[in-house]
Amino acid sequence: FGLGGVGGLGVGGLGVGGLGAVPGAVGLGGVSPAAAAKAAKFGAAGLGGVLGAGRPFPIGGGAGGLGVGGKPPKPFGGALGALGFPGGACLGKSCGRKRK
């Protein structure tokens, strides 16, 4: 499951379609444009692809931890965490703040 999700994200590379389709399709679908813009702005898209391809182990673990306990109210935050849990967490926080 973790590898599959990471594969989708890594292959997607953009962290837009893949991100919304795999980890938090329900929650991310609503904020797909915002999350996509933020991801592209911060370069998380490219980083996500590289990290997804190179580090499947921490991504899978990070995705589960962030998605479940890290940011329950912000699904896209968890999804970005899956892309690159260290930067993803910050991204999720920033996104949440800006959106609010």
UniProtKB/Swiss-Prot annotation:
4-hydroxyproline carried by residues? 72, 86
Single GO cellular component term: extracellular region
Modification note: Elastin is formed through the cross-linking of its soluble precursor tropoelastin. Cross-linking is initiated through the action of lysyl oxidase on exposed lysines to form allysine. Subsequent spontaneous condensation reactions with other allysine or unmodified lysine residues result in various bi-, tri-, and tetrafunctional cross-links. The most abundant cross-links in mature elastin fibers are lysinonorleucine, allysine aldol, desmosine, and isodesmosine.
Compartment list? Secreted, Extracellular space, Extracellular matrix
* Keywords linked to the UniProt accession: Disulfide bond, Extracellular matrix, Hydroxylation, Repeat, Secreted
Give me the disulphide-bonded residues.
90-95
Q: Does the keyword Secreted apply?
A: yes
Asked if the keyword tRNA processing belongs to this entry, the reply reads no
Q: What does this protein do?
A: Major structural protein of tissues such as aorta and nuchal ligament, which must expand rapidly and recover completely. Molecular determinant of the late arterial morphogenesis, stabilizing arterial structure by regulating proliferation and organization of vascular smooth muscle.
Could you give the subunit structure recorded for this chain? The polymeric elastin chains are cross-linked together into an extensible 3D network. Forms a ternary complex with BGN and MFAP2. Interacts with MFAP2 via divalent cations (calcium > magnesium > manganese) in a dose-dependent and saturating manner. Interacts with FBLN5 and FBN1. Forms a ternary complex with FBN1 and FBLN2 or FBLN5. Interacts with MFAP4 in a Ca (2+)-dependent manner; this interaction promotes ELN self-assembly. Interacts with EFEMP2 with moderate affinity.
Family to which this protein belongs: Belongs to the elastin family.
Official protein name in the record: Elastin
Native source species: Ovis aries (Sheep)
What gene is this protein a product of?
ELN
